[in-house]
């Protein structure tokens, strides 16, 4: 049976993550409060951030920057700013 969470990002009850994907207290907070759908949205933004800003995940400062962006996106409702990205226009 799927585990549901009250997703703070989507502001609705939705299927939760199957297991804790991120370490520590923040990982527990994500597991308890973020849905699979919201996590998938974050992963798309994360990939774009890493590529556009040429982040190196071996660099502590880059990992800290990415973690702060994740907190802002998932818990504070702030959109990720990606320079030069223009969303596709739907017809």
From Swiss-Prot:
<keyword id="KW-0408">Iron</keyword>
<dbReference type="GO" id="GO:0005506">
    <property type="term" value="F:iron ion binding"/>
</dbReference>
<comment type="function">
    <text>Could be a mediator in iron transactions between iron acquisition and iron-requiring processes, such as synthesis and/or repair of Fe-S clusters in biosynthetic enzymes.</text>
</comment>
<dbReference type="InterPro" id="IPR036766">
    <property type="entry name" value="Fe_traffick_prot_YggX_sf"/>
</dbReference>
<dbReference type="Pfam" id="PF04362">
    <property type="entry name" value="Iron_traffic"/>
</dbReference>
<dbReference type="GO" id="GO:0034599">
    <property type="term" value="P:cellular response to oxidative stress"/>
</dbReference>
<protein>
    <recommendedName>
        <fullName>Probable Fe(2+)-trafficking protein</fullName>
    </recommendedName>
</protein>
<comment type="similarity">
    <text>Belongs to the Fe(2+)-trafficking protein family.</text>
</comment>
<dbReference type="GO" id="GO:0005829">
    <property type="term" value="C:cytosol"/>
</dbReference>
<dbReference type="InterPro" id="IPR007457">
    <property type="entry name" value="Fe_traffick_prot_YggX"/>
</dbReference>
